Amino acid sequence: MSTFTLFHVVISLVGIGAGLIVIFGFLSGMKLPYSNALFLVMTIATSVTGFFFPYHGITPGIVVGIVSLVILALAVLALSKRWTKTYIVSCIAAEFFNVMVLIVQSFQKIPALHALAPTGKEPIVAVCQGAELVVFAVLAWIAIRKKAFLLR
């Protein structure tokens, strides 16, 4: 693994960890400003550094990176304007995309998972991504309905 790839992976994992803490804050009503800042910075950095890998045409990774940056721009705007619901949904959506990439990369790089899905198009990958979508959608729904977190 190159130094750049290792850097990209580390900031991605830090962003995912911070994102989970941020979601906990949404659910518990805690603002956690340092975790929010770390999540936004690391997740933006992850998306940006993803564009510095060798270009082989438009790939799902490039599309996810673009979508993620648009969502993160919305999160930053929502934070500055104190749009609580928009901030919650955009942060959880950005975390969803980060974890989705983690799932795909795990099936590509971890030998035991790769044996289950050598092409990445096997049903097990779709099941994992579908389960992830359900979990993050439920977390967003609970966070919005609970109204524990406010940007005021």
Q: Model-predicted segments: where are they?
A:
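Polytopic transmembrane helical bundles with strong interfacial aromatic enrichment
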Residues: 1-113, 117-152
